């Protein structure tokens, strides 16, 4: 973990659906709160699965958060924070380059930036903002789920439509839960066609 005297840094928590990304973000932010560091937690406006103004894991852990749409919104609310946490980075409305620039700007000013999000979309293609932040981050933690088909480590998010893999021409971002996505390993993942 970083100390305030260490200066800014970017930490990325990534993985497929149901790998515990938000749970890990919440765990880190609870430590920040215990350490009495000033912080802000942000969640994207597009994520409507849980109550507005909360970051929530699939297991039920929750923390208060600020719901925003863009990096400009984050920067407007993060002025005095020592730590900025951004959940579901891949769901923000903003241009991916703006998200990356904003995270860099905060870290360059001494802020510890913790982002969590999917590294790959349902087609197993990288989300652009996450791809760049993975390369720029001081710390990267890739988490794994358990494949629903075979029990191996899962690294892919299989989107389902009526119980079948979504086609390649389906929208890249569709917010959903267990009814729409399954965690799958490389072998059990069915590529979108």
Swiss-Prot record:
Transmembrane segments annotated in the record for this chain: none
Catalytic reaction annotation: thymidine + ATP = dTMP + ADP + H(+)
Active-site residues (renumbered): 88 (proton acceptor)
GO cellular component, as recorded: cytosol
Entry's EC annotation: 2.7.1.21
Binding locations of Zn(2+): 147, 150, 185, 188
Location in or out of the cell: Cytoplasm
Coiled coil start-end: none
Alphabetized SUPFAM superfamilies for the sequence: Glucocorticoid receptor-like (DNA-binding domain), P-loop containing nucleoside triphosphate hydrolases
GO process annotations (BP): DNA biosynthetic process; thymidine metabolic process
Subunit note: Homotetramer.
PANTHER family: THYMIDINE KINASE (PTHR11441), THYMIDINE KINASE, CYTOSOLIC (PTHR11441:SF0)
UniProt-recorded name of the protein: Thymidine kinase
Organism: Chloroflexus aurantiacus (strain ATCC 29366 / DSM 635 / J-10-fl)
Name of the gene: tdk
């Amino acid at each position: 973990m970083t100390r305030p005297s260490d200066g800014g840094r970017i930490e990325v928590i990534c993985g497929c659906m149901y790998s515990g990304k938000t749970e890990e973000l919440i765990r880190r932010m609870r430590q920040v709160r215990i350490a009495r560091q000033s912080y802000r937690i942000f969640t994207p406006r597009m994520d409507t699965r849980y109550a507005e103004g909360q970051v929530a894991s699939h297991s039920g852990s929750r923390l208060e958060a600020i719901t925003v749409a863009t990096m400009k919104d984050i920067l407007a609310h993060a002025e005095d924070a020592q730590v900025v946490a951004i959940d579901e980075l891949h769901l923000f409305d903003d241009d991916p380059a703006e998200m990356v620039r904003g995270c860099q700007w905060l870290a360059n000013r001494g802020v510890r930036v913790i982002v969590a999000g999917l590294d790959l979309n349902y087609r197993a293609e990288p989300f652009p903002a996450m791809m760049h932040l993975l390369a720029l981050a001081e710390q990267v933690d890739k988490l794994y789920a358990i494949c629903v088909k075979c029990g191996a480590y899962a690294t892919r998010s299989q989107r389902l439509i009526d119980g079948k893999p979504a086609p390649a021409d389906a929208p890249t971002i569709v917010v959903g839960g267990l009814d729409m996505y399954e965690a799958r390993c490389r072998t059990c993942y069915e590529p979108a066609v």
